[in-house]
Amino acid sequence: LHPIAPMIVESGPAQEMVRTGKDLLSGFGLDMIPVPISTPGFDNAPYLTSANWVTKDPDTGIYNVGNYRGQIKAPDRTGGLFLGQHMGMHWKKCQAKGIPLEAAIVIGVIPSIAYAATAKLPYDFDEYRLAGGLAGEPVPLIRCKTIDLMVPATAEIVIEGKISTEWIEPEGPFGEYPGYMGHRGIAPFLEVTCITHRKDAIYTTLMSQFPPSESSKIKHTGTEKVIYKLLRHDAGNPAVLDVAIHDEVSGSGQAYCVVKMKKTNSGDVWRALNSTAGFSGSYAKICIAVDEDIDIRDPAMINWAISYNVIPDKDVMVVKGKSPGLDPSCYPPGVPTHVSRQTPGSALLIDATRPWPYTPVSLPRKEFMERSKEIWEELGLPTLKPRMPWYGYSLGDWTQQDIEEAELAVKGDYWTTGEKAKAKRVKPT
């Protein structure tokens, strides 16, 4: 991937309509946007979920585009849960300078921006550049009307405003990625200065809450690739072949991560597991390494590897110091948000690679299964959707004698093998 810098344009459909001043309190503020309640019966307000927050470092000017939730609180005010993210670092820098943080919430963006905004990138890497690389062309940006920021010219809706660094206020509860309601906490808020939008703007949302969800799917797509790059390229571990995260068992893919490896030594495995556990805050609470024949997107195969490749007292490690994120097991009810964020968690590392060569997978060899499939299809039976392992294959512990005797068996000449066994009789001890 080669990042491509954005290009500045003079105008765009994102600013076909401009709402400022009294308009914001006369039916053309946040109340004109049809924001749904994501978890009816539990959420305390509508929340922006497909909100791509745009800010820039007040010292370097480098942009950050991140997807963070926002509680709608008034026609001209929304909350924002971002203090633990890169945008939160911008906020703290502005707080030290005694100035508000300018921000724009961009809704309805091209896919490359949406994917870039949900990927965990280095702090000083501009997501606009990643979006350009994904799209193969520069992202067109226009200047905001009331703040000094550049936003995507083709967006559906742009909410401009300033975030106080002097005050924070209650935010939440909201249905969150672990599959549980997030508690009420204290968070910053944005005071809207302008809303621009297309003439016939379409509001887009991400249904979040219990996984798998729209938000978990878009997040884990980018996260898999970022962790793969971290392990194979940044950490220089060529044994790493692929990475999968499982939102169907762990919420948004943050907690459960599986690494496929071409194992040559156990050192490469533990290096990969420790690097994965150290990735970005609360991600990868459970890290599992498996061999190259395991389908890392099939939970059944992963459990097979854990069940028969792992000696628990040798192949399992717990590492401390993980960020808890929104993991409810890390702190009891009633703990203030600013305290819970500092509560240390831990990670479980499992080496589920085979410790030595194993006998073949106990299914018929591939050619026999393929012939069975042909017969099945000739009979017009329902379409088969085989999943690995659907045929037997060698795992290293199989002798030439084993191969020859198996060939004799399928030819019907297993009597020969019986005679060999008879010739090698011994008395029991």
Feature roles, as predicted:
Residues 1-429:
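Extended, highly charged
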